[in-house]
Regions:
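Donor nucleotide-sugar binding/catalytic pocket of nucleotide-sugar-dependent glycosyltransferases
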Residues: 2-6, 156-199
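A short helix/loop element that forms part of the nucleotide-sugar donor recognition site in Leloir-type
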Residues: 3-8, 93, 194-209, 265
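N-terminal strand-loop element at the rim of the active site
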Residues: 6-20, 24-32, 36-88, 255
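A conserved mid-protein helix/loop that constitutes part of the nucleotide-sugar donor-binding site
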Residues: 32-40, 214, 218-239, 255-261, ...
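Short His-centered aromatic/hydrophobic patch
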Residues: 108-114, 133
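Nucleotide-activated donor-binding/catalytic signature segment of Leloir-type glycosyltransferases, i.e.
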Residues: 261-277
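Aromatic "clamp/platform" in nucleotide-sugar-dependent glycosyltransferases that forms part
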Residues: 278, 297
């Protein structure tokens, strides 16, 4: 995060006629924690002065795409980043900046995967390049080596780090640079989450759940990080040994959804586990729950827990 000194001469020009446009980096704008946090801020900023545009890495549309475009944001679609696409992706990023030299602020939310964008932007003397730490560490898998390499080599290209917490900053930026990261709160609109008995009963009626039954809940992507398999094992044991009429609400989508559905069938819990998909009304669904479980392998500061 020491590149800012070399770019002082390349200042951001602010005019009253056009808003400052910030380029946000994401995989896809679905209803994940980081995505939802950015959208919470996006809805409340003065978009006549500051606009968010989004570089995503999936061709399919995300859950927030319509809202982004309605608020004046632009969405640019890149190819997914994989080891076999590095050269093609690097060329695509170079072409993007050839076509869009107007971006003077880059804000990445895809951890070390923003490496190629950060490097290209630094080479073009973009004055503000931010990486945002959202997780405390990465799971060990086939991509771990690449993640570790990019995490270390991206740091000189950054002008600033943002983080949701100290552990997340230390993991992405290292001990020394992590201390300089700016803590940005994972904000929510607290008014929407105030308890309301009428909403609780209404949601339970919609889900065909009685007012007296115990409802356990979880909100999160269906991926390895969120540890749904263990969550189901815990719920299965809870039903068997303590509360045979309990229900479980699973809110989210993801690549492991079919595997989780199969696990539900194996446990013979089809009538008690409700896969609700990605929902825009999580604040309402939370009202129906008595217990919230969150057994993730890793988190920075979860928006679901906030």
């Amino acid at each position: 995060m020491d590149a800012s000194a070399d770019r002082k001469s390349n200042e951001i020009n602010v005019t009253m006629e056009e808003p400052i446009r910030i380029l946000m980096l994401f995989t896809i704008m679905n209803r994940g924690g980081a995505e939802t946090m950015v959208m919470n801020y996006y809805r409340h900023i003065d978009r006549n002065r500051v606009q968010f545009d989004f570089m995503v890495h999936r061709q399919e549309r995300g859950a927030y795409d319509d809202e982004i475009e309605a608020m004046g944001g632009k969405i640019y679609r890149m190819i997914p980043l994989h080891p076999f696409t590095f050269n093609t992706y690097r060329k695509q990023i170079s072409d993007f900046f050839d076509q869009h030299p107007e971006y003077r602020i880059i804000h990445g939310h895809c951890s070390e995967s923003g490496y190629f964008v950060y490097r290209e932007a630094a080479g073009r003397r973009v004055p503000v390049i931010i990486a945002h730490a959202h997780n405390a560490h990465a799971l060990f898998d086939t991509k771990w080596l690449f993640r570790t390499y990019f995490k270390h080599t991206m740091r000189p290209y950054l002008t600033q780090g943002f983080t949701c917490g100290k552990e997340a900053a230390r993991w992405l930026f290292g001990n020394e640079l992590g201390k300089k990261a700016i803590l940005q709160r994972n904000a929510i609109d607290t008014f929407l989450y105030r308890f309301d008995e009428a909403v609780r009963l209404e949601v339970r009626q919609e889900l065909h759940l009685s007012k007296d039954v115990t409802v356990v809940g979880h909100v999160g992507r269906f991926n390895r990080q969120k540890n749904h398999e263990f969550l189901l094992e815990v719920f299965h044991k809870y039903v068997q040994e303590f509360n045979p009429t309990a229900h479980l609400l699973l809110v989210g989508t993801g690549e492991l959804q079919k595997a989780i559905q199969k696990k539900v069938q194996q446990f013979r819990l089809t009538d008690q586990v409700h896969l609700l998909g990605g929902r825009p009304d999580v604040n309402r669904l939370l009202q129906a729950m008595d217990l919230f479980l969150f057994p993730s392998f890793m988190e920075g500061l979860s928006v679901s827990m906030v």
